Amino acid sequence: MDVLPMCSIFQELQIVHETGYFSALPSLEEYWQQTCLELERYLQSEPCYVSASEIKFDSQEDLWTKIILAREKKEESELKISSSPPEDTLISPSFCYNLETNSLNSDVSSESSDSSEELSPTAKFTSDPIGEVLVSSGKLSSSVTSTPPSSPELSREPSQLWGCVPGELPSPGKVRSGTSGKPGDKGNGDASPDGRRRVHRCHFNGCRKVYTKSSHLKAHQRTHTGEKPYRCSWEGCEWRFARSDELTRHFRKHTGAKPFKCSHCDRCFSRSDHLALHMKRHL
């Protein structure tokens, strides 16, 4: 909330003209502004708790049925277009060459990437009926796959599995492939402004937020569950918080620490947003 000061610059000049100085001590009005900011923060409504039983996912059988039906429908349409399609045309040489090239590029990029980020493909193939089914069916649940959500195997596109030669298991290089080497390519997921892919998605009903780090996703999910693991260690204080930075700001109330100092005057503040509000007085 942006609270505009009632005292204008002309009144301040009048005080300086009459007394010869302007007191830097906080006035009653400034105390009122700080109190309004604190009340607005701590009187917010608590997030409602959502039990795990209320989260509904598609069953594994239904998902695989949709995948198989989509694949059969795609094959039937290909048979209608070409009267006698040879089996070798299902895997074109250019497609295999792209897979090999993508695997080499992904091996180089994965070694220099951060270990906390997931490996996810950024290239999207033109004909991918399985991907359309996955998009229409919603989110993948933990019952669909045995790997955890942070596993790189979840970020593998289904078209890479169907593109392999029958009877041949996909190699680790092909599983990790997907980056075409072009900086302008975009994948299925949302891309953040700094170029990193946001691959950590919230699976609660009605929430579509995506994050680049798993720690940020865990902090966001606490707003759904109501979990507050960070407790104030001050004697006699029972406050609990969902994020560590909220606990740090709260602890400054006990210690009286004010690390944020104004560069124009000697005023100090315990929070950065309070300093930003104060800096508007110097503009």
UniProtKB/Swiss-Prot annotation:
Region (Disordered): 106-198
GO aspect biological process, one term: B cell differentiation
Main localization category: nucleus
Ranges of compositional bias, category Basic and acidic residues: 183-196
Annotated consequence of substituting residue 116 to P: Found in prostate cancer samples; somatic mutation; does not up-regulates CDKN1A in a p53-independent manner and significantly reduces cell proliferation
Gene Ontology terms: cellular component: chromatin; cytosol; fibrillar center; intracellular membrane-bounded organelle; nucleolus; nucleoplasm; nucleus
UniProt motif 9aaTAD: location: 62-70
Xref: Pfam families: zf-C2H2
Zinc finger (C2H2-type): 200-224, 230-254, 260-282
Effect of residue 172 to T: Found in gastric cancer samples; somatic mutation
Signal sequence annotation: none
Location in or out of the cell: Nucleus
GO terms of molecular function: DNA-binding transcription activator activity, RNA polymerase II-specific; DNA-binding transcription factor activity, RNA polymerase II-specific; RNA polymerase II cis-regulatory region sequence-specific DNA binding; sequence-specific double-stranded DNA binding; zinc ion binding
Record keyword Cell wall biogenesis/degradation present: no
Tissue specificity remark: Highly expressed in placenta followed by spleen, thymus, prostate, testis, small intestine and colon. Weakly expressed in pancreas, lung, liver, heart and skeletal muscle. Also expressed in fetal brain, spleen and thymus.
Effect noted on mutating residue 198 to K: Found in gastric cancer samples; somatic mutation
Role: Transcriptional activator. Binds a GC box motif. Could play a role in B-cell growth and development.
Subunit record text: Interacts with ZZEF1.
Family, similarity comment: Belongs to the krueppel C2H2-type zinc-finger protein family.
Protein name: Krueppel-like factor 6
